[in-house]
């Protein structure tokens, strides 16, 4: 598969940017990703009250050995991710210069060394809040528009999922402020980006930081954090031609209490689709306090609540192209199809009836959505000039629900013409209740080894994840008319209960050794212990056969690579990295009859990163070779056979120029 993408845009107000991205990829095996059917409406933006985009996070000094360096490192730590102080619209915001591809931002998605994206021996993209505003990005799914070689989609049963480098779904890990919560197809939800500082994307295996999964890459959503300085307030609003609207408010800065800084954000997005009776309503509110106890110690606490209420589009029935009364569309779908929901049959040419393009076949009482609550707290302690300790504890509580007619399919055996009750419908209801607790602690040591600067990070992480599912087993079905469906209501429901518990503990080490001022070795290794237990009860409360069961996994993953600045603004890099994930499904739905094994994935990657002397032009190039072994495929329902391996090879090129 070869794809060529061209993207150009302009930066409003502060400067103009001409952004070109080029992607050419060859994938030996890739998975298709369902795309959102909602039309991408062009919003009419009302200018913000105050525009004060956050500056990129600052990288601490490589080897602070003097009091001056120590002070600089503390300052960078306190102001990490700080928004610029309010300035006139004609004046550039204060803080470090953001490069065209934003590679000067510190990221946590690929490494815990505290280095900028440019210094990583991997392809790391950072989409800043400013970039999101310039490109009109409103939701986390839209972030794919700003990333090279990344596809995003809102499939109704698994919203906010991504595909990159030939992998998709649960092989792409999703993190929230560096915290994994579980397989993305089970935990992913659409989210407004107004409260985010940046979105970090690493491409290729990344289990070193992201843990189980991350075969194709990982995406980290990073919230805005407080800054030290005058209070800055900002607000925005927009509306579109479908009467959808979006509004938000943010505020942050120093309080009257010495050393106490705050950040608060709230937003709401009502996004209406072009299919009858479809919409997505997203609400986010978040806040954080930072308190500088002294020059060496900072403590903080954060809370975030997210809610989405949705009426998703579940598809339009395919109909026989030659059936009596059908008004076919052209250039939309073509080919042969048979209704496998009803046992198949002889494949026939199909089309979509032109009169059903906006028809909703879902039940009237359909709903989908989620309520999510995050509580996080931590500290950062500079123990000495060269040793620092940071830690965060977190709690996450989520309730998700689906209550829909998920299948609408033409049945030739009932009526082979428009007007008959020929559309077969089938229901599914599902509820999730998830509770996650955990801790991540990093010890960073900067030192000098034989005259060479060295940075070492040891990370200890532990979490307890309870994931409960209540799922309808009746799959109630009925028939409706193709052109005038009587949508009706959901009908009877009888639920089975599934309880999954996952305890995870990991120990990882990372190191960067600068052999010279221009050449550095970067590597890391992660040891992980994962204990899974599952129990399942049928709709009558009886324990199902082969349950409960448990399994322990002990994957070891890592990365080794180098970076070499061969000339000013020209850096070469290469890496070898590995990842692990379940062989047949995500870990929340493994059954005792499925192979309880892990796949192993590896990547070879090499590339070059270019940055002009004036930091107005930037380009990256990478070539990769990914292989995922021990892959199984479904057969006869819940039986699985070894399929061998998946492989993906390709190249990526990104370039951007900012005009004066």
Region roles according to the model:
Residues 86-125, 129, 135, 141-180, ...:
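Extracytoplasmic beta-strand/coil segments of soluble accessory domains associated
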Residues 124, 132, 143-144, 199-204, ...:
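Non-catalytic regulatory/gating segments with a bias toward low-complexity or hydrophobic composition
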Residues 152, 163, 179-203, 222:
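Short acidic/polar hinge/loop motifs at secondary-structure boundaries
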Residues 194-197, 208-287, 293-299, 373, ...:
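Outer-membrane beta-barrel translocator/receptor signature
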Residues 269, 273, 286-292, 296-380, ...:
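Acidic/polar loop-and-plug regions of large Gram-negative outer-membrane beta-barrel proteins
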Residues 292-294, 434, 453-465, 498-626, ...:
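Structural signature of Gram-negative outer-membrane beta-barrels, strongest in the C-terminal barrel
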Residues 375-398, 425-537:
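Face-selective signature of the C-terminal outer-membrane beta-barrel domain
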Residues 378-394, 398-404, 565, 572-573, ...:
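Membrane-embedded beta-barrel scaffold of Gram-negative outer-membrane proteins
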């Amino acid at each position: 598969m070869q794809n060529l993408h061209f993207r150009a845009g302009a930066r409003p107000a502060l400067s103009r940017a001409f952004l070109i991205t080029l992607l050419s990829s060859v994938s030996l095996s890739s998975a298709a990703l369902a795309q959102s059917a909602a039309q991408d409406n062009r919003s009419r933006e009302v200018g913000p009250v105050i525009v004060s985009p956050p500056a990129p996070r600052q990288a601490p000094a490589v080897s602070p050995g003097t009091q001056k360096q120590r002070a600089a490192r503390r300052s960078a730590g306190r102001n990490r991710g700080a928004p610029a102080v309010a300035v006139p619209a004609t004046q550039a915001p204060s803080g470090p210069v953001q490069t065209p591809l934003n590679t000067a931002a510190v990221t946590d998605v690929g490494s815990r060394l505290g280095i900028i994206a440019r210094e990583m021996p991997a392809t790391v993209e950072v989409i800043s809040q400013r970039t999101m505003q310039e490109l009109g990005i409103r939701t986390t799914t839209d972030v794919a528009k700003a990333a090279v070689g990344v596809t995003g989609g809102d499939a109704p049963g698994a919203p906010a999922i991504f595909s990159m480098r030939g992998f998709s779904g649960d092989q792409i890990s999703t993190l929230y402020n560096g915290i994994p919560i579980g397989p993305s197809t089970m935990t992913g939800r659409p989210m407004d980006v107004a409260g985010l500082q940046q979105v970090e994307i690493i491409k290729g295996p990344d289990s070193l930081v992201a843990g189980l999964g991350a075969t194709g890459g990982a995406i980290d959503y990073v919230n805005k954090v407080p800054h030290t300085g005058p209070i800055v307030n900002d607000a925005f609003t927009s509306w579109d031609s479908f009467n959808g609207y979006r509004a938000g408010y943010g505020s942050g800065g120093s309080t009257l209490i010495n050393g106490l800084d705050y950040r608060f954000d709230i937003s709401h997005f009502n996004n209406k689709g072009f299919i009858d009776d479809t919409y997505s309503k997203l609400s986010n509110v978040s806040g954080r306090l930072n308190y500088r106890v002294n020059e060496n110690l900072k403590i903080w606490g954060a809370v975030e609540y997210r809610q989405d209420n949705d009426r998703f589009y579940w598809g339009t029935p395919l109909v026989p192209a030659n059936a009596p009364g059908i008004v076919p569309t052209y250039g939309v779908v073509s080919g042969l199809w048979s209704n496998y929901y009803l046992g198949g049959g002889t494949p026939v040419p199909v089309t979509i009836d032109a009169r059903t393009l906006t028809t909703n076949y879902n039940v009237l009482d359909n709903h989908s959505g989620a309520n999510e609550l995050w509580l996080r707290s931590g500290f950062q302690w500079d123990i000495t000039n060269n040793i620092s300790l940071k830690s965060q504890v977190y709690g996450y509580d989520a309730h998700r629900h689906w209550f829909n007619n998920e299948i609408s399919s033409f049945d030739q055996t009932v009526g082979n013409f428009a007007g008959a009750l020929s559309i077969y419908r089938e229901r599914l209801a599902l509820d999730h209740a998830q509770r996650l607790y955990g801790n991540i602690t990093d010890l960073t040591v900067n030192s000098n080894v034989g005259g060479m600067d060295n940075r070492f990070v040891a990370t200890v992480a532990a979490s307890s994840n309870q994931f409960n599912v209540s799922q309808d087993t009746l799959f109630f079905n009925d028939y409706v008319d193709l052109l005038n469906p009587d949508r009706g209501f959901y009908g009877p429901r009888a639920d089975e209960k599934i309880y999954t518990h996952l305890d995870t503990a990991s120990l990882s080490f990372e190191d960067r050794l600068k052999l010279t001022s221009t050449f550095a070795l970067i590597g890391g290794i992660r040891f992980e212990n994962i204990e899974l237990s599952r129990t399942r009860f049928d709709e009558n409360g009886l324990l199902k056969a082969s349950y409960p069961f448990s399994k322990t996994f002990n994957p070891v993953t890592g990365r080794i690579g180098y970076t070499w600045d061969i000339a000013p603004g020209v850096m070469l890099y290469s890496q070898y990295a590995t990842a692990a994930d379940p062989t047949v499904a995500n870990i929340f739905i493994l059954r005792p009859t499925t192979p309880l094994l892990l796949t192993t994935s590896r990547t070879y990657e090499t590339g070059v990163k270019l940055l002009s002397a004036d930091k107005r032009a930037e380009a990256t190039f990478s070539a990769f070779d990914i292989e995922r072994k021990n892959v199984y495929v479904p057969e006869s329902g819940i039986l699985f056979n070894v399929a061998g391996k998946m492989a993906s090879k390709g190249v990526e090129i990104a370039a951007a120029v900012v005009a004066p």
